[in-house]
Amino acid sequence: DVISLNVPDVVKVYGIFESTNTNDAACPSINMGSMDGPNSNTSDLIIGERFVGQSSGAVGIYLTRNSDISIGFVYLNNSIFEPEEIVKFKDSNVTAIVTLVNSGSPNITNDFKFKTGQNSAFYGISNITRKADIDPPSRRLKVYYARGTYDTNDTGDITTVNSYGG
């Protein structure tokens, strides 16, 4: 029922995906061409940035760099990216043409509740809990999330109770 994410400071779960076979689960992905950034590949993009399909209106958030031409993402609306459409990345300002759209594994995010691990007495590990009326997953899961981190080489950070919103 409860799956630990094994880390604190998770602020958002972007997606939970269940594999359809014995392989690892995967988020949706797109292949792109004609990227107009300095390196003309996905190294010009910023993980976590939003991007929009100019004809479909689909909005995604970039999660993983799969290769020089492919990224993994999650949809932020109900529209779907289309082959041959132009996508515009908001932070890097890169545009590209979608050449292939892969739907990825089934997104079962709505089958779970997310808990940050924060409570009034202590700050614990983040987790997801399966909703009571949902059958347990039978295949591998992959959870994509955003979390706060600190650079261990940075000697200037101080964290207090006011550092966390809640």
State where each predicted segment sits:
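Signature of Asx- and small-polar-rich beta-strand/turn repeats characteristic
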Residues: 1-39, 44-49, 54, 67-83, ...
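Short, surface-exposed secondary-structure boundary micro-motifs
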Residues: 56, 92-93
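Polyanion-binding and phosphate-handling cores
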Residues: 81-82, 88, 94
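Glycine-anchored, exposed beta-strand/edge motif detector
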Residues: 89-92, 99-101
